[in-house]
């Protein structure tokens, strides 16, 4: 079972849990390969939460540029959940498992979004293939006056497409929620066997900001 706690982060990056009726420490359990699925599901759940928030904001945007930005970010976040990672990265989801028994061809829609991410957003394969070059001709003087290219890129019916992606995100998030509950319980039982004294010997859990260019 998942619980949510309020917390503060002190100057050293240590997390301080709030609102508990007992003295507590929040200790960091050393990483193990057997926790990989749990780490992966946690990250996927976070990505899906962001994707859904981006989609909601995209629907409420009046400006096309803002809507496109939120939509593209949502597609990229969703696709990450199903995309293979490097050797030591997160475990990817299987669309076949997640959408098993769901009607209305969710896997077909899912594949379209993965293709959209790969060919339009992360790369420009389709836009490159669709790029056109034109020559402007002066018919009367029978000569070319210059070269021009239309500034066009792929467009989508954003409102309908957002609704479809939102449904896929919700289905995936529900599936992840159930799997997270199972995985958390397995990990809890495994870690609890170590006993209080061993666990109390672990370091306080700290977080650090890993973003940045330096």
Where are these regions (language model features)?
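Long, charged low-complexity segments
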Residues: 118-122
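Amphipathic alpha-helical interface segments
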Residues: 1-112, 127-136, 142-214
């Amino acid at each position: 079972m998942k619980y949510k706690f309020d917390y503060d982060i002190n100057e050293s990056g240590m997390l301080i849990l709030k609102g508990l009726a007992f003295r507590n420490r929040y200790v960091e359990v050393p990483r193990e390969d057997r926790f990989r699925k749990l780490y992966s599901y946690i990250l996927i759940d976070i990505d899906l939460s962001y994707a859904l928030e981006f989609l909601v904001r995209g629907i409420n945007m009046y400006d096309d540029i803002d809507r496109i930005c939120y939509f593209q970010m949502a597609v990229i976040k969703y696709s990450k959940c199903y995309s293979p990672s490097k050797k030591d990265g997160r475990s990817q989801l299987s669309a076949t498992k997640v959408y098993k028994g769901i009607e209305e061809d969710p896997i077909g829609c899912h594949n379209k979004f993965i293709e959209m991410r790969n060919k339009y957003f992360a790369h420009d394969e389709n836009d490159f293939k669709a790029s056109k070059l034109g020559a402007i001709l002066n018919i009367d003087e029978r000569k070319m006056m210059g070269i021009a290219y239309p500034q066009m890129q792929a467009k989508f019916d954003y409102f309908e497409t957002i609704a479809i992606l939102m449904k896929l995100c919700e289905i995936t998030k529900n599936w992840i929620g159930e799997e997270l509950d199972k995985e958390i319980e397995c990990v809890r039982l495994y870690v609890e066997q170590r006993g209080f004294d061993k666990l109390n010997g672990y370091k306080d859990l700290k977080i650090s900001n890993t973003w940045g260019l330096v």
